[in-house]
């Protein structure tokens, strides 16, 4: 059967369900696909298909994730749901499934639980821009005051991690009722209300081409009589012939002008996000540029050596280390296109980090790298990946 053509007539947004085990994330995911399919067309995905999510390998890490899609009046959504807590941790840290926003599911009868807190913290650390809350299983709570108490508790928890706890929409309902097509007031209607809140509260992500120009440099060539050409895939933004750009990272930042852009040996006026290009740069010698630096819009990105990060350390089964690491561990940190050695400083009270753990660390690199909060990296030893991380805060 031929694949359906993807109709891009609505803006696209990536979301996911997060929250404590058994609070109803997968049931809610199934309920959203059902209700949205009834209202806007599309196909419902049943619970069993989401629950037995296939295992994927992303950067050597085994992650189970289920992907579903649906649409509302305003947008087309791709939605991820993970069966296990470990899958969430890995998914969020590696960025395997990008989230422009998340739906936090909290069981009204239990209130926030340890993983509720951990998923909110992870969302903060990895830069999920906005959350919306679904207070699930409200039919199991008879006492209105108890519901209000749980809502208050959730808001306080969100505020504690710098989300806008006072104003985040909290929708109350029962995902199971919606899925089973009963009690519409807490079932179907709550799902419609939830998706309206998601439409309004989760900002439309900026498309990569609308962001500032950045291209990680993969290779450098010298073309006699023409000068130096750097090649790479444009990550964000657009570069036009004649634009002034900066070369950032590893060495001192230098300014240059792009005098030519080519793709597949054809000359272009511009290169944009997603294009693999060669950029001819003026007045820069072959030995002045190297793989691992980036070409960027002047002033848009700065080089740093010290940062804190949220990392996941691969388990032995995933091909990671067999033994823990301790303070002063010095692996390579692989950013975009290159490895830089760095020293790991562990948080107070943490003696060691075991394979399979996730932990917040501080890192001191021996050379500066162009970085922003939210940048992903791999941790490597002798060319093999032993961990994955995301920059949560730049310190120097």
UniProtKB/Swiss-Prot annotation:
Where are the annotated segments for G4? 136-139
Q: Where does GTP bind?
A: 19-26, 81-85, 136-139
Q: Which Gene3D superfamilies match?
A: P-loop containing nucleotide triphosphate hydrolases, Translation factors
- Residues covered by region (G2): 60-64
Which CDD domains does this entry report, sorted A to Z? EF_Tu, EFTU_II, EFTU_III
EC assignment = 3.6.5.3
The segment(s) forming the tr-type G domain are: 10-206
Task: State the name under which the record lists this protein.
Answer: Elongation factor Tu
